[in-house]
Regions:
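Multi-pass membrane proteins that catalyze or facilitate reactions on polyprenyl-/lipid-phosphate substrates
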Residues: 1-266
Length: 266
């Protein structure tokens, strides 16, 4: 029964993490509905996020390898053909800074004082944000992005520290509002996920190592991580496909319905 519970929650995390529907909001809702001790386990969050991170790294492995290679090649040669990815690497850094700095200060406050009713309200906000960009196409490609664009998108990511505000949704909205193409906005959103996820994992690894239950829960943790990774991979591909078709309205409707129900119930 315990393994099944971890498996189900791993699947939920994996499905909601890359989609613009807020994984943190959904986990908070399930915690309120079922009062599960699993959802109060910070080690669980670290483990399943690691599974999701691995999935995104695999999905974008060619893009990531190209960015890293071109970054160092530009430093070495200064050749123009490497300059786009060199700049893009710095754009990722700039976009990460706002959430990385503010996250350290507000994380504990949010965990303690953010109610499930507020999660419902934030899901409605996510719905409105997604609705606002449903018809926007944008013109700017990766090579056209500016540091101001990166900063603006990074500030949208700060808002997503609130449970119920989707990180991927907020950053895609920020990108689309900066006139990026759908593909460019989505790719940059996933690139921003990587350093934020790594930082969160590093901050929590000490607690994971010193946890008294790590040995007894090793198998449930492993199962939830694998489940989260596999489902994240295919959910991310689904998001990419839906973005290409310009069908963000589906996610907007979903977030509005779930948010309204949660707001009324709690």
């Amino acid at each position: 029964m315990l393994i099944l519970k971890y498996l189900i929650l791993g699947i939920i995390q994996g499905f909601t993490e890359p989609l613009p529907i807020s994984s943190s909001g959904h986990l908070r809702i399930f915690k309120s509905l079922f009062n599960s001790e699993v959802l109060s386990d910070m080690n669980f969050e670290i483990i399943v996020n690691f599974g999701s991170l691995i999935a995104i790294l695999i999905l974008y492995r060619k893009e990531i390898a190209s960015i890293i290679k071109d970054f160092f090649m530009f430093i070495k040669t200064k050749e123009k053909k490497y300059s786009v990815n060199y700049k893009y690497a710095w754009l990722i850094v700039v976009g990460t800074i706002p959430a990385a700095l503010l996250g350290l200060f507000v994380k504990d406050f949010i965990e303690e004082y953010f109610t499930t009713k507020l999660v419902g309200l934030m899901l409605i906000v996510t719905s409105i944000l997604l609705f606002m960009i449903k018809d926007i196409k944008g013109k700017k490609e990766k090579k056209d992005m500016t540091y101001l664009d990166a900063l603006k998108i990074g500030l949208f990511q700060v808002v997503a520290l609130l449970p119920g505000i989707s990180r991927s949704g907020a950053t895609v909205v920020g990108g689309m509002k900066s006139n990026l193409t759908r593909e460019t906005a989505l790719n940059y959103s996933f690139m921003l996920y990587i350093p934020i996820s790594v930082a969160s994992m590093v901050l929590g690894v000490k607690d994971l190592i010193t946890a008294g239950n790590i040995a007894t829960l090793a198998i449930p943790y492993l199962i939830s991580m694998i489940a989260a990774g596999i489902v994240t991979y295919y959910a991310a591909k689904l998001f990419i496909d839906i973005m290409k078709k310009g069908k963000l309205i589906y996610f907007s409707i979903y977030c509005f319905i779930v948010g309204l129900v949660v707001f009324i119930i709690f």
